[in-house]
Amino acid sequence: MKIRVHATIANFGPGFDVFGVGIGEPYDELSFRESSEWEIRVKGHDVPADVRNTAVVAARALAEMAGEEVALRMKLRKGIRPRSGLGSSGASSLAGALAMARVLGVEDERLILRAAMEGERAASGSAHGDNVVPAYYGDFTILESYEPLRVRRIPVDFDVVAVLPAVEIPTSEARRVLPPKIPLKDAVRNIALASSLVLALKENDLKAVGRLLDDRIALPYRKRLMPWYDRARKAALEAGAYGFSVSGSGPAVFAVGGDVAQIGKAVAEAFEGFGIEVDVYVTKAGRGALWF
């Protein structure tokens, strides 16, 4: 059996640690079978090929939650680069949790997602869900609460281009630059942006969605780690993008609206001005985990 779990765009503009959406590319693929001992083989991007792998961590977590003693032999094709801002650890975590769920016959979505979040805890120190949740559903997702786990979803299907520069921004560093408090006016603005963005998505108004891809909570501070951000955004908008923002904590960025292939080329050229190579993914939003 094989499962494909796609990349995700966490935050999606103003939804810091709350919004997310699944996209078609890049993706991880995991094949697996029940075994007497744990084993994982990895092809593609460099991640641990042992029990530290988030796919193994999440699979073991689900088995423990279900009160079962089961091991898996897994083969992971790691297509999402680690530390990309595209939900790499979340994709592998969800793949592992789904694999164990299939073996055990577990259908409880909350249990599966909680197990996947344990993989995220192993990777980042925090059992966050803003990547594994949209990776599971594919929809635009809103993490309403963790205790209890509540998720709101809006089905989406629109073109998006994600551009991944050949640089790394450690999540710990991206968190460190955030202030403990933000000005009230910025909080008010983000509430307006986030609530309007949800309505625009429900109305399928992509131009409004693009206009609302702004953020006053994290982006102003994280831009210090991304000296190329403003030039890349300018290139995207001049090429016809409706909106542009950073994916997760970066370094990946994304744009919606217009000719996303041409927008991707324009953004790539902006990065070239900084001597930075990129991978460009012209894809679709609204892609969740798939069995095949």
UniProtKB/Swiss-Prot annotation:
Coiled coil: none annotated. Its EC number is 2.7.1.39. GO terms for cellular component: cytoplasm. One of its GO terms (molecular function) is homoserine kinase activity. This is Homoserine kinase. It is an enzyme of class 2 (transferase). Belongs to the GHMP kinase family. Homoserine kinase subfamily. It is found in: Cytoplasm. It comes from Thermococcus gammatolerans (strain DSM 15229 / JCM 11827 / EJ3). Pathway: Amino-acid biosynthesis; L-threonine biosynthesis; L-threonine from L-aspartate: step 4/5. Keywords: Amino-acid biosynthesis, ATP-binding, Cytoplasm, Kinase, Nucleotide-binding, Threonine biosynthesis, Transferase. PANTHER family: HOMOSERINE KINASE, HOMOSERINE/4-DIPHOSPHOCYTIDYL-2-C-METHYL-D-ERYTHRITOL KINASE. The lineage of its organism: Archaea, Methanobacteriati, Methanobacteriota, Thermococci, Thermococcales. Gene3D superfamilies: 3.30.230.10, GHMP kinase, C-terminal domain. The gene is thrB.
